[in-house]
């Protein structure tokens, strides 16, 4: 008998699904089941149909809290479910029962696959909408779609109807990423290229993980003049490129590499770690007294910073721990001591004319986008090897935490343009899309006619909504790995291969030769 069922992440057991006492991510079976209850309650709320600002907030919070590596705390998950139930009763005199998620997991293979693509896409999109909302940006059309799509998940739908919703999820997510892009750039300025050190300076410091730039800004303000340095971790690295964040002299550098290495890298760390979003792994004894969560992130017995965003406990812990007695050198995954970031759409498009001329003159043969989520699977070395094998006359755009597989490499430059250009966080796929569209316009061709190939890694649900956006835009010949999602049925995969030439990654040498027609 199954104790849980979850197959939403790339590391799901046997690439079929986690169904025992705990998932591969570390969440217990009861936690997984409570998260399903939250989704079931949201589907009931969506079917009630009476949207308010409060229900919008709960939609985003509820979906976000069920993303992989966000919330391991049954108490807070059940509180969210109770809040949803109360609001559902408040907005409608008609009773709308919670949807039983077991019905979705037991559905026919293709219906389950398509509904899962929609649901996991909604989860990823909710994270982006949540961050935008924190900066005062909302889009009524994006908000409405959460209700439409969730309500549909609780109904009988044909595969054709569900496929339309899959692509519509991608369309709405494009608008949502544009919303977050506007929120971030209006608040913090357009990112500029910057070199970020990986050495941790001596003295007190705080490590900030996750994606929430607003939380980072508040922490920078509260630590000003206190003799505490701030270091980004994992997906927070692109913060260094934003003028309104990089202006703080105590935002010093980046700590460590991808999220999946945190249990090793945080071992006995003499400083606190603040998790603003995923990815949080089960916390180990050697640093558990130094971990803090905020926003939707929650873990049993770990102190949580509430909505008032008073980071005093984190600051006090930093002063108590004291940091390293001497400068503490760290390296990237390939031994590098610095990384670069800040090559978002404006920074890259400032050189669009040069890139076009370099392509036309044959100095740039091809452009790759190598990025997405990172993870622990050994097969993810594919992305490092692929980047290393790319010819010297090719450019690499990268983004999200998958960048750590290659971002400390020194691959040189072409005509003064670095061969590795970090566009930002996973939501900055929007920047990469804008760059591709601008280059296509400059060349007078379609995006699929550009010398451009996307080589994507996925792990969790934000990668799903980005993939759906790329499919909505009609992008072809995407390479996806390190495995095909367990929730993509053979028939759905066949459809994606036939209509979009989606290609599972194989080995870097073979794939590179196929892409470059060698």
Question: Predicted regions span which residues?
Answer:
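Anaerobic metallocofactor- and corrinoid-dependent redox/one-carbon enzyme cores
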Residues: 2-31, 35-36, 168-518
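Long, compositionally biased, glycine/small-hydrophobic-enriched stretches that function as flexible linkers
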Residues: 2-203, 207, 227, 234-237, ...
């Amino acid at each position: 008998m199954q104790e849980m069922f979850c197959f939403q992440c790339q590391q799901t057991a046997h690439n079929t699904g986690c169904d025992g006492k705990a998932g591969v991510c570390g969440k217990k079976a009861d936690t997984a089941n409570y998260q399903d209850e939250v989704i079931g309650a949201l589907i009931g709320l969506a079917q009630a149909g009476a949207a308010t600002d409060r229900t919008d907030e709960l939609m985003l919070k509820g979906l976000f809290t069920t993303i992989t590596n966000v919330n391991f705390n049954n108490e807070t998950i059940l509180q969210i479910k109770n809040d949803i139930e109360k609001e559902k009763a408040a907005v409608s005199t008609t009773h709308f029962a919670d949807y039983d998620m077991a019905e979705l997991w037991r559905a026919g293979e293709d219906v389950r696959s398509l509904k899962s693509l929609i649901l996991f896409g909604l989860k990823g999109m909710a994270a982006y909408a949540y961050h935008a909302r924190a900066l005062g940006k909302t889009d009524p059309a994006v908000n409405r779609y959460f209700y439409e799509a969730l309500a549909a998940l609780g109904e009988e739908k044909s595969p054709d109807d569900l496929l339309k919703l899959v692509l519509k999820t991608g369309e709405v997510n494009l608008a949502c990423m544009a919303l977050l892009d506007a929120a971030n750039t209006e608040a913090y300025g357009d990112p500029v290229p910057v070199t970020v050190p990986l050495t941790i300076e001596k003295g007190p410091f705080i490590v900030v993980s996750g994606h929430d730039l607003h939380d980072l800004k508040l922490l920078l303000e509260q630590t000003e003049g206190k003799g505490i340095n701030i270091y980004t971790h994992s997906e927070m690295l692109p913060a260094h490129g934003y003028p309104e964040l990089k202006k703080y002299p105590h935002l010093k550098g980046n700590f460590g590499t991808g999220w999946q290495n945190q249990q090793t890298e945080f071992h006995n760390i003499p400083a606190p770690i603040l998790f603003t979003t995923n990815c949080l792994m089960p916390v180990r004894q050697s640093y558990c007294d130094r971990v803090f969560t905020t926003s939707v992130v929650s873990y049993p017995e770990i102190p949580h910073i509430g909505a008032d965003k008073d980071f005093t406990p984190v600051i006090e812990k930093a002063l108590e721990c004291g940091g390293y007695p001497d400068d503490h050198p760290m390296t990237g995954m390939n031994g590098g001591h610095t990384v670069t970031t800040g090559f978002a759409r404006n920074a890259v498009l400032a050189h669009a004319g040069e890139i076009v001329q370099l392509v036309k003159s044959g100095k740039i043969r091809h452009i790759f986008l190598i990025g997405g989520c990172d993870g622990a699977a050994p097969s993810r070395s594919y992305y490092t090897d692929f980047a290393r094998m790319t010819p010297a006359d090719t450019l690499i755009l990268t983004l999200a935490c998958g960048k750590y597989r290659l971002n400390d490499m020194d691959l040189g430059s072409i005509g003064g343009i670095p061969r590795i250009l970090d566009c930002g966080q996973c939501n900055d796929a929007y920047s990469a899309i804008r760059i591709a569209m601008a280059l296509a316009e400059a060349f007078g061709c379609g995006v699929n006619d550009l010398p451009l190939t996307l080589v994507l890694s996925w792990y969790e649900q934000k990668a799903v909504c980005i993939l759906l956006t790329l499919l909505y835009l009609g992008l072809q010949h995407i390479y996806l790995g390190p495995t095909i999602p367990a929730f993509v049925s053979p028939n759905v995969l066949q459809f994606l291969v036939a209509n979009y030439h989606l290609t599972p990654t194989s080995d870097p040498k073979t794939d590179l030769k196929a892409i470059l027609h060698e």
